[in-house]
Amino acid sequence: MIRRAACLHLFAFCILGVNNMSDTLPQSILFCCDHNAVRSPMAEGIMKKLYGTEIYVQSAGVMNDLEIDGFAISVCEEIGVELSRHRTRSFDEMAQGGDHLSAFDLVVALSPASKQRALELTRFFHLEVEYWPIMDPTELGESREVKM
């Protein structure tokens, strides 16, 4: 239940956040959070479902120390978003793989730590960094039954 609520909350942010921008959609968006294991991959998957190939969408984390969260996979599957093939990566790994921050039109930070890191990494670029405060649902210590 909690993960489903978090997914729907993120879904609403994706719709409202993009629709509240100017009339033209950004060509590329990077979502970021702490570990790239729950919030940012969910946002990436939802945006790809909503906009297909209209917008280049990627995600990254401040660090890469976790695998994609199983509950995030399950909840997104319920709304037709595929996350099981997602591989977590950090900002540094993203750059090493050829996705440089300067190539994005918009960075959406979903946690305070990712906002700080995104601002540090983009201080020399003309790049917008937005902060959408999304609580990390994994920090809620509830049972599997309650989360599902």
Residue ranges and their predicted role:
Residues 9-10, 45:
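A periodicity- and composition-biased signal for non-globular, repetitive helical segments
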